[in-house]
Amino acid sequence: MSTRKIRNIAIIAHVDHGKTTLVDELLKQSGTLEGRKEVSERVMDSNALEKERGITILAKNTSIQYKDTLINIVDTPGHADFGGEVERILNMVDGVLLLVDAREGPMPQTKFVTSKALALGLKPIVVINKIDREGSDPDAVVDATFDLFASLGATDEQLDFPVVYASAKNGYAKMDLAEESDNLTCLYETIMGSVNPPEGDPDAPLQMLATTLDWDDFIGRIVVGRVANGRIKTGQDITVVHADASKENFRVTKILGFVGLTRVEVPEAEAGDIISVAGIETINIGETIADKENPIALPIIHVDEPTLTMEIHVNNSPLAGTEGKFITTRQIRDRLMKEIRTNVAMRVEETDSADIYKISGRGELHIGILLENMRREGFEMAVSRPAVIVREIDGKKQEPYESVTVDVESEYQGTVIEKLGKRGAEMTNLVSNADGSTRIEFNCPTRGLIGYTSEFLTDTRGTGVLHHLFHAYGPYIGKLPGRNNGVLVSMENGESVAYALWKLQERGRMFVGANEKLYEGMVIGIHSRDNDLVVNPIKGKKLSNVRASGKDESIDLVTPIKLTLERAIEFIEDDELVEITPKSIRIRKRKLLEHERKRASRPD
């Protein structure tokens, strides 16, 4: 197949703007999936966590055969926390499909990926989706998209982008809102006409950049990437050029292409093809698979540096080992090492203590996804509060800042502006939306946002929408206010007693219900005041042998707050840890015994 018959394109979309639905429809209508049974809903989200949260974490490839052309669609993570993934993906494609909701317009999360795509000189195609929705305003959204591109420094050619109006759910697209349409033909044709075929010479020496790494239990490590030049065959001897310019020889055992979403074995591939190669044991992302006789490296892709760091401890609570399968230092270390083989933007460092590791990533979500995956795999561990990575630039301390966008009902905007102001945020823009809500933009230190999401949802009665995105490093602003409330800490090991919890309810809100296993030093609730209170949730009612006059008081327990991983990580202070097991999320003090905590809090 000559490279003229291939189109490689990345799809960029905000959470819930209909990316996966659109890809499902493109697959169905092109007939690519005829050989497959019913398309499972949302075919592109393959990881259980992605389907559940509706976000894309790992980029995936889909191939669509349209007429005599193969269209490779690569999914991009919409979140800046996965910036490492994004940049490598965009290096494989020649155009981008930006999918925008006809009502919400371009969102901050897509801004990050779009800016990277424009900087690489890729030409965008804008698809305005959900035009059948009530309250949609496609024309205003096209204008907003144009303004976004202009603000991101797009060239005149990039600003002259084609616009396709679509309803992915109903399976139609059109170039003009007045037209009638019942299929996606005009979208296929726009991709064919606007996206250039991949450059590359099939007759030149082989060059292919390792874009993502995957693992298969049967064939081992799989390298995914686009063949930049030359050809690659099964059984061919190749050379890997590592980042330090050292070289290593391997033999290709299998080449896999994509048909729809399925990997299929192919005998060979040439310049322009996006493929998976097996048989290469040691290669890192960004390194080059090259011709054995004439190995020439491609430029290594620079990945954004981490901005947040956290400690992972081996779980040493009194309940350690009762709920998980993997609990030892070695098992945790092996799992973290496996993660950084494929998750390039993540760093893992050993610390002075044998059972504590330091992990650094692009944001709370980036690290949170790894912890949630480990929890589902059966790991037990404890993690510390996230801290930002502070840099010294020209002798001055600098910390990461994020651009924050909030959409709130007008009645809550004062509270939000005040709360974020206390956290070091500066307001940069305020506009009224058509539906009566207000969109406010801020620049805020990343530190100020840790722990803010749940407070924001409480302040806006669950109606507000908050997005934040790494912006740049800026001046360090000193101490920021911490949590307003203290916590209730258990003084005993045992099972919680309903009567004791009932008596403690007037002191604050509980994280635990009756008959739950507790231990000394475990945080069981939020104190209504700003100090920590050590309490006994295990004490039963004193019973006397003299019958009391009157009835027993009825015990009426308030439903406890359910802790999720994100909420717990946001909530804790520096002297606390989140204990994570496959069945439970608990909060505990670093030092479980009260006299140890008192000693640690005394000034030296």
What is the role of each PLM region?
Residues M1-V100, E104-P106, A144, L213:
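P-loop NTPase switch module centered on the Walker A-proximal segment
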Residues D16, L22, G54, I73-D75, ...:
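Residue-level signature of catalytic and energy-coupling elements of molecular machines
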Residues S40, K67-I71, N91-L97, V126, ...:
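Gly-rich Lys/Arg/Thr-decorated short loops/hinges at beta-loop-alpha junctions or inter-strand turns
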Residues V86-V100, G105-F149:
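Conserved P-loop NTPase nucleotide-binding/switch module
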Residues K123, R133-G193:
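Canonical P-loop GTPase G-domain recognition
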Residues D160-P162, E189-G193, P197, V223-D604:
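Accessory interaction regions appended to the cores of large information-processing enzymes
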Residues N196-P197, L209-D217, D394:
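Short boundary/loop segments of OB/S1/cold-shock single-stranded nucleic-acid-binding domains
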Residues D203, W215-G220, Y499:
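A contiguous, basic/glycine-rich beta-loop/short-helix subdomain that forms a polymer-engagement track
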